[in-house]
Design a protein with these regions (language model features):
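N-terminal membrane-sensor/transducer module of prokaryotic signaling receptors
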Residues: 1-134
Length: 134
């Protein structure tokens, strides 16, 4: 196998792995709406606000940070990285409201048209764009 064919094959494998990670991340981040609704209803959560706020605690954040050197070459990486960090601020704020018993305010912050909904949608769109570009 020539070097160029081998390199192309290696690149395809890497792209397939990135696609899998993106798919997992979209699913995992989608679960946060469920977790937040649960926290609002119960006024408790297994997650601490500061843990939720920190982007490198979740699987996507761990992957984005651990593979940064190899992922920087992708134009969509920086956008996803930045949006991901911003997205973590909103669930932390909502979690804080939920744990403080501010159910109506927390529910509103989670609803359609909220910062959480908009940032989540932008992050998902950016990840899908990245996946399609591979």
């Amino acid at each position: 196998m020539s070097f160029s064919i081998w390199f192309e094959h290696l690149s395809t494998i890497k792209n397939d792995e990135i696609k899998k990670q993106i798919t997992k991340a979209i699913s995992a981040h989608g679960m946060w709406k469920v977790r937040l609704k649960d926290a609002i209803n119960k006024q408790s959560s297994e997650f601490e606000v500061n843990h939720v706020r920190t982007p490198h605690h979740c699987e996507l954040g761990k992957w984005l940070n651990s593979e940064k050197a190899s992922l920087l070459k992708f134009p969509d990486y920086s956008k996803v990285f930045d949006l991901h960090a911003k997205v973590h601020e909103e669930p932390a704020r909502i979690m804080q409201l939920a744990l403080a018993g501010k159910k109506d305010e927390a529910s509103h912050a989670l609803g359609l048209g909220s910062s959480f909904a908009n940032l989540s949608a932008h992050l998902t769109q950016a990840m899908m764009h990245w996946k399609q570009a591979l």
